[in-house]
Amino acid sequence: MDFSFSFMQGIMGNTIQQPPQLIDSANIRQEDAFDNHSDIVEDGGPTPFEATLQQGFQYPPTTEDLPPLTNGYPPSISLYETQTKYPPYNQYPNGSANGFGAVRNFSPTDYYHSEIPNTRPHEILEKPSPPQPPPPPSVPQTVIPKKTGSPEIKLKITKTIQNGRELFESSLCGDLLNEVQASEHTKSKHESRKEKRKKSNRHESSRSEERRSHKIPKLEPEGQNRPNERVDTAPEKPREEPVLKEAIPVQPILSSVPTTETSTGVKFQVGDLVWSKVGTYPWWPCMVSSDPQLEVHSKINTRGAREYHVQFFSNQPERAWVHEKRVREYKGHEQYEELLAEAAKQASNHSEKQKIRKPRPQRERAQWDIGIAHAEKALKMTREERVEQYTFIYIDKQPEEASSQAKKNVTSKTEVKKPRRPRSVLNSQPEQTNAGEVASSQSSTDLRRQSQRRHTSLEEEEPPPVKIAWKTAAARKSLPASITMHKGSLDLQKCNMSPVVKIEQVFALQNATGDGKFIDQFVYSTKGIGNKTEISVRGQDRLIISSPSQRSEKPAQSASSPEATSGSAGPVEKKQQRRSIRTRSESEKSAEVVPKKKIKKEQVETAPQASLKTGLQKGASEISDSCKPLKKRSRASTDVETASCTYRDTSDSDSRGLSDGQVGFGKQVDSPSATADADASDAQSVDSSLSRRGVGTSKKDTVCQVCEKAGDCLVACEGECCRHFHVECLGLTAVPEGHFTCEECETGQHPCFSCKVSGKDVKRCSVSVCGKFYHEACVRKFPTAIFESKGFRCPQHCCSSCSMEKDIHKASKGRMMRCLRCPVAYHVGDACVAAGSVSVSSHILICSNHSKRSSQSAAINVGFCFVCARGLIVQDHSDPMFSSYAYKSHYLLSESNRAELMKLPMIPSSSASKKRCEKGGRLLCCESCPASFHPECLSIDMPEGCWNCNDCKAGKKLHYKQIVWVKLGNYRQVLWWPAEICSPRSVPLNIQGLKHDLGDFPVFFFGSHDYYWVHQGRVFPYVEGDKHFAEGQTSINKTFKKALEEAAKRFQELKAQRESKEALEMERTSRKPPPYKHIKANKVIGKVQVQVADLSEIPRCNCKPGDENPCGLESQCLNRMSQYECHPQVCPAGDRCQNQCFTKRLYPDAEVIKTERRGWGLRTKRSIKKGEFVNEYVGELIDEEECRLRIKRAHENSVTNFYMLTVTKDRIIDAGPKGNYSRFMNHSCNPNCETQKWTVNGDVRVGLFALCDIPAGMELTFNYNLDCLGNGRTVCHCGADNCSGFLGVRPKSACTSAVDEKTKNAKLKKRRKVKAEAKPIHEDYCFQCGDGGELVMCDKKDCPKAYHLLCLNLTQPPHGKWECPWHRCDECGSVAVSFCEFCPHSFCKAHGKGALVPSALEGRLCCSSHDPASPVSPEYWSKIRCKWESQDSGEEVKE
């Protein structure tokens, strides 16, 4: 801040107002300051300030008889200048990009060149003096001395104001300084009212004389509301054009607007391609264009330097005035490196060069690439073609009109204190009274007020409304007339360079007469330098007037006036500023400004009118604002039915703040959509792109299969593939009429979604909306594929993460995010989605499997075996270079450190050594993750070529909120550092902007609390108990110790959260039975066939229709006794037949209950008689092959509940996936129901019938008669007296129970115990290696052998009855007849000749693997122990 300004501000205490234009620099020099915004007024001519006078403005007397200045100021300088509006279109730093100051010492003739009709008077700082009589009225040309004759020092301080706040440095380089004057509201309303009254009386005569000498012209609104416009530019003639010409002096009129030149010294013309440099942003491709307000493309700024108006090539439309020194001719994108080299040469120090050479951030680089693509395309065009193709079109919108002028003219003088809102009243009909009539019919006070707002009179034609850059010129003819504000008001926020649209809440705007018509819209297209704006009215010209009460009660519903929108008035002041004696009162407020907005062509040009809805942008529209040539700013999503565009909010509010009026008017800044955008993260992350879409996401969630971009304007194939395409991606120019079918559906050659090989032998997924095709062999490779009777459900309908937990029901339920390129799907949310995946839409992503890794980003494997030891690395940090970075998890974040380390050799120093593990040897390294293994630990040979571990083969991925070990760099001296994988939306914005690719995810380092992007090759999971991999280290860095403690604590927190979540999930699922599909009849699966008998083959019973209960339980029905159900067309009883329970499904009411120890059960609600039909056991009818396949799959997925019931050899009912209530009936050794096979219409079906009378409320059970296919037995919890203890074991009969009772009683007598001879059951050592431990025992009778699973090369115990390899020939696998008694080698009769020889150990046979003289070592027998078991431990001999 300049000291001269702060000094004057503190001494004078006056409010400093905004300048008439944006000023180049904040370093404003106030030496020799004078009023540099006034106009020279000729005798008898109109004063320029008469164009727009504010409320409370006091007319000064004329200058005919006033003495000249005595304080050294030039006599031509006036204390009052015209009211200047803040330009609605933001320019670069303070109106220019040259970074120079705006106010310097120069002559008035160099500074003033044109007149600004609508300007705003600046305050006049008065030097405090002793109380004296008030001075005489001042004049526009001079500073009036006081009555005492002593001159009064009047200083004019020019101050840069932007976004309603004072600006004292470049908006591209720093935040705005918010310095509000402390003395703004020092005077009370009463004092202000009294002063205004005195001034009014004192200068009444002066004002009357001035009105007689200066006639009030009726100016054309187009001329009035255009700042920076030269007076000599011929405007459209107003009604009183002769008066205006007489009033305008002939000599040049001074103005504060920079001189606009279009001929002399102009290097670039409209349509030329240039590079421009703004602030810290890189050289950006631009096109020279015409300013929509000045209608010129080149001007001389206040320092005499030339500036060019350029529009930037990017995804968002931006424009600015740029200094000529920062503009270069564009010759191609290769020129960028030359510009960097040139800037580097001019750099003063090394740090500046580093900044210049620093890589651009991710978002900025993406936007820059978009701009380069446009520029390269435009480079091939001629200048005229570029102007036609890329020039912005500005859609102008009429704001809400103020109340009628007549109503304002009759207001009393006391209303001077009323808060004033500058506004313009539009009317389709001209005013009936001219200026003279107004002057003669109204009081002087009313005339003064009207002269302030005469540019808003009803006599005026429509002034230029807000210009919004809607499309480029190439699409002006196709601009739809329906793109209008529908019952809404448009509020455009001002930013440092380019306004951004903010669509306010939709309000119904009504005029004073209540016609209820809405705002019409105008379209402006800038045709070139000096050309007038072409206006094409969309719709009818309607007058929209809102009463003052409506605006005062609902300020948020009021549209900004043309005075604020068409001119260059600044944004609303953040705080009300109380003016000096000659300014408005403290109760007056500034009008809300609606700056302009530009929307570039690419956002809407390809979108048809039918799809003009708020949606997701294609391409780089998802990229943050920080990559554009702008600073970050608040943005709110649009609700208007306009072109598809979404904006991302990077902060809750603008860093420069909003004025009170803006916040009150546009509360959509903090709307839900904007809040959702604020939480969004990087475009290349899953959750980030989900959050950015917000309310603009299409429910259909369509993605083009060619370009992989989401959008609403897609063509859907109506064939079997269910895919969507962009019209451009299909090579079409228009949307095809009628039904569209893609080429694959037309030819029938669909590619397999797994192997991508086309052919007709592929099968479609059974899900109707899926549309994916697979080879059957390909889809069977995925454990998440579900095969059904009618086909299969592909893996994209099952969560890959949940399937790893062997919970197939959980994995197949819920909303999925499906990969666009491969058969992978995850549940929506961070819990299941693999870290590093990229979201395309809310339900479509590209998984991390498609990460393209280079040789430089290969996996960094650990130096230990994951099986036998969770490795230990010992290192002494003798190398000072490495020791300084060994415990720094983030050293690669430093560019200098990275460059320093990369100069060193990749071979680790000799100080790093691997601790000898127990087994030693070579390590087998995974190509996808850091895992390493000893081949011996995996029982495999060292493979050739690439190899992936089992987890990577199975598709196991890392997830967010997972604790991991991370290593940055390829050096062993750099430790593996504990970190947590973070969701991209939870990391800071600068971390989101770091360079990363598909498959990368951010991690948070414990201890140092840094972030970085890594991939799976540098990360492996943290396991409870992990400490560090440098236990041999004598000293551990404090940061690393802290990291270990934080990681352990965080791991326990996440573990507790996970366990709590699982407990809640288990509790929730325990309230209802596991999911299944309820069916009423059996469903045939596979090759099973259902037999249907002919009516002639159905037996006929001998029951009569007149019987009491024909075919009932107590009847002598032959069909019932033979378990054959009667047919209604064959049975003599007809409809009264009671032997049709299967067909009619006559089940007693029952309910599913939760039992104490047996899971879910079935309980009857009413009493059931003995023999009564209870239920039919229904499910899927499968054959034996399918049954064994399902059992095998169930074992692999750790499923222990089975619902299979065998009807015949090739007919098995599986009620697991589908069934009825009978599937919940539990087993009991003493059941109350039994299963019976009945023939129903020729087909065999299974029914459950009551074995006894069952009272209401009792659980229904039956005996499973389980056939044990495995060697394990399931414990029975039925609680019956005759319970066998295990399922599949026959329950004890009555005779057996009696014998057991007798034996139990006999034990009470004294007996003499006799030791029974024991016999060996199974050996307690492995027959292969001789060690003990967990052993698998052979099920062959009298075989005592047992084995380790690893010795058998098995990972799980074998299922069913298992025989050890000792009983099979080693050569052919047939039954062995000769055995080696020291190892599992055995031979059949054909291969046993000469294979075995007697040994020296008791003549036992041994194979060639043993020495016959000493087949085993002496220590071998010391390890062998046998398990002995008595034949009858309870047998005792009676004394």
From Swiss-Prot:
According to the record's subunit comment, the protein's assembly and interactions are: Interacts with BRD4. Interacts (via KIKL motif) with BRD3 (via NET domain).
Superkingdom, according to UniProt? Eukaryota
Species name: Mus musculus (Mouse)
Q: Taking the first listed entry, what is the main subcellular location of this protein, grouped into a coarse class?
A: nucleus
- Which InterPro entries does the UniProt entry name for this protein? AWS_dom, C5HCH, NSD_PHD, PHD2_NSD3, PHD4_NSD3, PHD5_NSD3, PHDvar_NSD, Post-SET_dom
| Record field: compositional bias (Low complexity) | 670-691
Q: From the Swiss-Prot or TrEMBL record, give the protein name.
A: Histone-lysine N-methyltransferase NSD3
Q: From the record, which residues define motif KIKL?
A: 154-157
Which taxonomic lineage does the organism of this UniProt entry have? Answer: Eukaryota, Metazoa, Chordata, Craniata, Vertebrata
User: Which terms does the UniProt entry file under GO BP?
Assistant: methylation; negative regulation of DNA-templated transcription; positive regulation of DNA-templated transcription
Residues modified as N6-acetyllysine: K790
